[in-house]
Amino acid sequence: MSKAMGETLGRLEAVIHDRLAAGEAEASYVASLAAKGRGKIAQKLGEEAVEAVIAAVSEDDPALIGEASDLVFHLSILLAERGLTWDAIAAELDRRHGTSGHTEKAARA
């Protein structure tokens, strides 16, 4: 991943935190979605995940890029609503690095 991607996620996270803190549902999609509750945020995340899968299976790369962007955006909202950060996700991925996927999954079971 490029440094630019980390900077992009950092900017996105900051904007989402600002919009959540402002709580202006009439002026902000992020705030309006959050006002509907965690369940609605999770539902929207699921919808975006399905759309990303459909784009991938149909081999439509531009659509997949768009849907993956929507997926990351909505995941960012859900993480922020829960008080979690991309740094926490990065730390977990770093912790798992070098561990076999089968081994890591078995450790969680």
Swiss-Prot record:
Keywords from the UniProt entry: Amino-acid biosynthesis, ATP-binding, Cytoplasm, Histidine biosynthesis, Hydrolase, Nucleotide-binding
Highest taxon above the source species: Bacteria
GO MF, any single term: phosphoribosyl-ATP diphosphatase activity
GO biological process: L-histidine biosynthetic process
Predominant cellular place of this UniProt entry's protein: cytoplasm
Pfam families linked to this entry: PRA-PH (PF01503)
GO cellular component: cytoplasm
EC number(s) given by UniProt: 3.6.1.31
UniProt protein name: Phosphoribosyl-ATP pyrophosphatase
Organism of provenance: Sphingopyxis alaskensis (strain DSM 13593 / LMG 18877 / RB2256) (Sphingomonas alaskensis)
